[in-house]
Amino acid sequence: MKIKQRPEDFVVREGYRFEPDLEGPVWVYRMDKQKVSTLQALERISKAFAVRRRDLSICGLKDKQGRTEQLVGVLGGALGDSEVLQSGDLRLKLIGRAAQPLSSRNITANRFEVTVRDLSPEEAERVPESAAEVERTGVVNYFDSQRFGFLKHGQGFIARHLLRGDWESALKAFLATPSELDRSDDAKVKTFWRDHWGEWQLRAPQAAGKRYAPILRRLREDPRDFKGAFLHIDRRLRMMALFELQSFVWNEGVKRYLGARIPAADLIGLRYQAGALVLPRSLPRELRDELWNRTFPLVAPDSRIEDQRVRDAALGALRAQGLTLEQLRVPDSPLFFKHEERPLFVRPGKLRVHPPRPDELNRGKRKVNLSFTLPPGAYATLVVRRVLWFATESARPVLRPSAPAAPAKISRPAAPRRPANEPDARATVAPQEGFLARQRARKEARAARREAARKPPGHR
């Protein structure tokens, strides 16, 4: 199974609501972007149209991969004389004005159109039945791999350094830890600062280094003020550093909770960036209705959890990371964890499976188009992988519980210590290779298939 082979294979359209105000100070544009993240798009708009970054507002962050339509608010004036503006592969169309900057309150839903490729004919035929299963059961509302960008790029959980008050390590993880997966100028900038840490009088030769100018300006003023430099990072990125750890603990707590309530035989497992997830294939109606109406906490120091089973699962996941609620504080800083309740399950709306067709990118394979809506904050990639779990190499049925695992290290997640009746998510998958090893194996397999396809019939 492959998704996002082309940008048009993964299309997201933001559903929105705002009060039009003909005299409002915020000009609202609909932005069409592809192969660029929302934060990167805002940075480009700021440069191209000479707008202060803090005067740009959005409803929510969207993934870099794929094609996205979403709103952008501009405080203080229009970007140009024309209603339609183009900046590279960004297209902006003025749709109105508003009294307030955009925020998450303005988003109503996200509509997805996803093309799943590289399916065998048998796998393609199974998709409608599996989609019907998802409609009956729903999907656990986990945070998927996109939530863990710092982890993906080898920077670990930056929040762990922050909780210890180790601002230098946190800044080094952000500014000077290049990803092995990234060949961009940004990675070269991070390599430069890894090799020249502390030599703040230097200048990275790549243009991408300009985005870190406020951080470096502070370090040139005071070379040991790592805290002040870290607080010059874009606010959204600082928040994401905290959210990654909080989201991981949420995922681990939900796994514990579901493992205590659902028989292992009814669960499947899927790997993701931070480990493995468990999802039910079927649920008794009474339990399903209960779980559909339940939330699960994103924990913070002020969390008060009434339900005993939820509390045991959430706090058990936190303890497995060597933390308590009281320790979820960043000392002497404006950064903080906030308690929130997140729906435990999500139900894709208007889920439609289109008939299989030949896949023009993968010889002899089929492609299937899926379309559905999700509420803000839910992950379409998880819905797609749940529907196509049988075609996902990282998926296996959950077979048995396992012995407790060791607590996590500082820079990467580890499997939590589990109660005896909880299934081991690692038992759901074959022995796990590293991400880079899996990428190399896929490339080698594709190369072998191409080589085999070039050989004449009957050749051995």
Which residue ranges define each predicted feature?
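Extended, charged/glycine-rich binding lobes that contact polyanionic ligands
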Residues: 1-17, 21-22, 26, 34, ...
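Generic structural marker for isolated residues within well-ordered, non-membrane alpha-helices
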Residues: 42
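Basic Arg/Gly/Lys-rich low-complexity intrinsically disordered segments
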Residues: 4, 222, 387, 397-460
